[in-house]
From Swiss-Prot:
One of its GO terms (molecular function) is UDP-N-acetylglucosamine 1-carboxyvinyltransferase activity. GO terms for biological process: cell division; cell wall organization; peptidoglycan biosynthetic process; regulation of cell shape; UDP-N-acetylgalactosamine biosynthetic process. GO terms for cellular component: cytoplasm. InterPro entries: Enolpyruvate_Tfrase_dom, Enolpyruvate_Tfrase_sf, MurA_subfamily, RNA3'P_cycl/enolpyr_Trfase_a/b, UDP_GlcNAc_COvinyl_MurA. It comes from Sinorhizobium fredii (strain NBRC 101917 / NGR234). NCBIfam families: murA, PRK09369.1. It is an enzyme of class 2 (transferase). Belongs to the EPSP synthase family. MurA subfamily. This is UDP-N-acetylglucosamine 1-carboxyvinyltransferase. The gene is murA. HAMAP family: MurA (MF_00111). Its main location: cytoplasm. The lineage of its organism: Bacteria, Pseudomonadati, Pseudomonadota, Alphaproteobacteria, Hyphomicrobiales.
Amino acid sequence: MDRIRIVGGNQLHGVIPISGAKNAALPLMIASLLTDDTLTLENVPHLADVEQLIRILGNHGADISVNGRRERQGESYARTIHFTSRNIVSTTAPYELVSKMRASFWVIGPLLAREGKARVSLPGGCAIGTRPVDLFIEGLTALGANIEIDGGYVNATAPEGGLTGGRYVFPKVSVGATHVLMMAATLANGTTVIGNAAREPEVADLAKCLNAMGAKITGAGTGTITIEGVRSLSGARHRVLPDRIETGTYAMAVAMTGGDVILEDTEASLLDTALEAIRRAGAEISETNSGIRVVRNGAGIRPVDIVTDPFPGFPTDLQAQFMGLMTKSSGVSHITETIFENRFMHVQELARLGAKISLSGQTAKIEGVGRLKGAPVMATDLRASVSLVIAGLAAEGETMVSRVYHLDRGFERLEEKLTRCGAHVERVSD
């Protein structure tokens, strides 16, 4: 099993290209099931979750071809992938596939809308809280679907004549459920209005692609999305937006170690709240023609309190990384997690590096320490794993991160990107 070995103490200097967003690519790939034409996606990252979803879509009958090109020697791949689901050969998404990645559950929306039925296993993925599917079920029921849960599967059927537009207000914001309901509503009869919809950039990106396919969606990126159903969707070509979580992660890495790095092919507007928190912590951040420049020279890391919130608030997917940054601050900071009830599993691993963190409910108190010291640590989920890498970059000596398959689910060629900026990071196999 692979591990990541880090020898800390080096500043980061150079250029890091930002990959396409995993959280945008996955729903875009699933949207290909809505049409019998070809959907072409550009800037798709090479990640374990993407490969798993390719297998799942193939199970439903999608014909998939990948054209990869290496953009820079030694760095990442930006891929163009063509999806053609001319015939849906199966409306069942089995446990052995869905259990490995939560987002694969989202196929329920397109399958139900296009084929009138879907049988999808309850999902897997990162073990962060319960993450129930109730909101998905309630939203699809509002479009006329009949849904039952039996034997670990969600069985959904549409009424004769297909789904019907309706109005549904989410009792709490859900990005995944917003994706699913929006996709299903594109082929429903009549108009659907989604209230308290997720405002994340990835939702707006999905709507942009669906509209290019012939959908009629307005309001994506706001709290109210309106979808006028159409009879069918056609193919399209769409470029996946930059990964704001990867952008924020590397910005925090520079703030942690010190240095001067250009984050290329990304946009500051995708993560304004997170960038402001990093500025308050002591980094200088400016926009360039090609992306974002992050600099921290000399000044120490200042303590900053944050609260995670749905977009445009501070992203929960950057909470663990920011906690890593705060372990080296000059005072006491607090991080409150409002999205997931069990997203502090990285605390005990950061403590192995010398961090001083205490928990009270959904709030973590971080007392900055003068130095961290390398140690063996274990990744518990995707974002927690990269927080350990960031901390290891600033720790004295060697840090060895195990269970890095979590990293491979969401960060494309992380060790290569960091190494090119002067970090001592390498992948080792047992």
